[in-house]
């Protein structure tokens, strides 16, 4: 993205993956060629310089990826790239023009990278599981808060107006958790299904 194009995003809201406003674009940083390398965003009162690849931009909609979604996106790209190189390298195994020692050295480099990607996937899986458990615990707290609210309303300890306002906030918070859990479960299912195939498996190039 060029500087002249990025101008239209100044003052635009930044959304999270659940369509919530979390900040606003107040500027951007370019390299010497005028390519935008980062947005300057006000998030929760803090000024942050955020690399462009952390955003998904569609039209004037700017979505800031969570750390888990961002890492997942990058790992998928790495996995596709290394799988492509493995497939290409396998096809060169019987090529008489290729020096076998050079092929073996190249093979070792590719396999090393592949194992690093697999390790990163395993670490991501732990993070996803931890976040899912954290959200489920928050869900339990909200359920208890909902019971308390309804009991107070039954006992006439809260006005109807305040009750309805508080009820909306709790239900919105619960829906927010449901939305994030849904996304995390999709990531988790992708990783788990991949582990049952030869996609995420340390390959030995033949």
Task: Walk through the language-model features, giving the residues of each.
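Peripheral interaction segments used for macromolecular assembly
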Residues: 1-206
């Amino acid at each position: 993205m060029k500087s002249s194009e990025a101008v239209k995003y100044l003052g635009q809201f930044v959304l999270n993956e659940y369509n919530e406003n979390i900040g606003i674009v107040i500027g951007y940083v370019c390299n010497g060629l005028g390519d935008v390398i980062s947005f300057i965003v006000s998030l929760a009162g803090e000024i942050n310089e955020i690399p462009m690849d952390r955003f998904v931009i569609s039209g004037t909609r700017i979505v800031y990826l969570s750390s888990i979604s961002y890492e997942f996106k990058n790992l998928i790209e790495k996995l596709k790239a290394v799988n492509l190189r493995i497939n290409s390298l396998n096809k060169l195994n019987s090529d008489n023009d290729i020096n076998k020692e050079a092929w073996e050295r190249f093979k070792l480099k590719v396999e090393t990278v592949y194992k690093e990607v697999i390790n990163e996937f395993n670490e991501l899986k732990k993070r996803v599981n931890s976040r899912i458990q954290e959200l489920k615990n928050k869900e339990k707290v909200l359920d208890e808060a909902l019971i308390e609210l309804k009991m107070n309303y039954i006992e006439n300890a809260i006005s109807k107006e305040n009750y309805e306002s508080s009820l909306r906030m709790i239900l919105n918070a619960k829906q927010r958790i449901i939305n994030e859990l849904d996304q995390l479960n999709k990531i988790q299912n992708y990783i788990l299904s991949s582990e049952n195939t030869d996609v995420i498996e340390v390959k030995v190039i033949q």
